[in-house]
Amino acid sequence: TEVTRSVQMYIDEANAEGGINGHEIKMITYIDGGDPAQAESVAEKIVQENKAMIVLGNGYSDPATAMGKVLAANNIPGMTSGATAPSVTEGNEWFFRVINDNTAQGSFVAQYASIFFGHKSAIILYEDNSYGSSLAVAFDDEFSAHGGTVFSNSPISSKSETLEKDIADIINSSEEKPDMFFLATYKRSGAVAAIYLQEHYPGIPVFGGDSLGADSFAAVVAEELGKAKADGIIDGIYAPAQLIFDVASERAQIFRDRYIKNVGEMPTWFAATSYDSALVTIKAMRAAGISGDPSQIAQDRLLLRDYLASIDQRSEDFEGVSGQIYFDEDHNYTQPLAMGLFSNDKFISAPVQLYHISDNDLPDDYLEKLRSGEILRINRQYFGRTRIIYVGIDINEFSELDIEGDHTYLADFYLWFRYEGEKIDFEDISFDNSVAPIDLGSPTEEKEIGNGHYTLFRIRQNFRNTFNLEDYPFDHHSLAIKLRHDTLERKDLIFVTDTLGIGEITREKTLDNLDKAHAFETISDWFPVTGFFFADS
């Protein structure tokens, strides 16, 4: 599973660094089947065996809650990387969560829909369990607080044999049609609902919960359609995600590359957060001073629990794939959720994202900005807006490589920008590592695509990077092309990888594209070993 693969990835890395005080870290695998009763049984088995320092995983809320009660009663820490219902950690001093809960998620989607889109009415369909109901309640409360009206808030079940009819009956029972639909569902019920809504109400926007916020949702939709692909039927559907790789950091790109190499498939945000759960746990074990002595396991568990609870602010010491991990008073990690949308069956970052604003950085007029929607408040934390610009590079050639002298190289490439909203002043874009300032000049191509803009440039310029020759003849060097906006900070604007334009951006695919373009043909004695596109911090 994604959990075991990701956790084992970090365990292998940690063991390569000496484990925990010289002790090797081992993973014991249990399967709860996504069922609360089975999860409770598994937890009781863990208690009886008395080997586990902590329990990681728990992708579903009801099983996680059931397991957490048993673990807490026996003073065993637990940490979920996927279960989002508030009940998972509420009142449980032994359970932690490395993602946002549904209170934060529902509030985020409601504010995004009402503030950024101006939606004033909604119909909610939710999974008939704690995940769906808590997400629906959070959305309903926040949407109503912003002056919205919820026409109906109804449960559906992915196990229903008449699911499509159930959905149709709910929608048809409403006398008025809403500005939007919100699907707080699992993937299968969400797929059936999305297909029905897109076929019968194509003009009404659809938002989903984080269960829908992944490329894998498109695969489930295709399966429901009986096709190989979803054929764009879910294009335009918005959903939040704990992490979207096209807007993520270099650390996230490295994780994705390693995961693909180890597993052979693209990771989801759940894989990333599962990796983070292992990272924060093992680092906490090292810092807490646990003995590793089986006879002291009860004391070690308490030390670990207490140390995890003490990680109550952002720190580079616990920086994972999804950011700097910490736990609030409810043992949740509240970070800026990413909002994505489907385009050509791919889940990509939406044109507007959020960034965290600390209490110390709140402007004096923050109350006014809260009312205007410039600042959002989610789970007692504040967030501002960030504009997203999709950027793509197509390398034609690297040449004139000077390793020992000026550390320069000539790059010939196409550069494009795809974005919505106000037009960009390209004079404000510069290249940090170009030998001489680059004037982009007139674009090679410029056109409107749907609601957005597309601008293409051809560039042939010299760039410079620092080359460390100490490891010669086994040295590795980076041929980087770094661009930024001169006047706007990252919190205002982020350049992200245009996965729609570039296509697959795995290490292997990137190298294959460079090889097909003969990009290194004129550089002798060197060959490419990796390639990344990422938004640097």
Enumerate the predicted regions with their spans.
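Extracytoplasmic ectodomains of secretory-pathway proteins
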Residues: 305, 331, 340-380
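Extracellular/periplasmic periplasmic-binding protein-like sensory domains
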Residues: 100, 194-275, 287-292
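Non-transmembrane, solvent-exposed beta-strand/loop segments in proteins
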Residues: 364-404, 409-537
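Short, well-structured alpha-helical segments in soluble
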Residues: 33-53, 111-112, 162-177
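Hydrophobic alpha-helical
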Residues: 61-72, 178-200, 280
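Segments of small-molecule ligand-sensing domains
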Residues: 261-271, 283-347
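Extracytoplasmic ligand/sensor domains, especially the bilobed periplasmic-binding protein
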Residues: 5, 37, 51-161, 203-239
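Signal peptide-proximal N-terminal region
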Residues: 5-27, 144-147
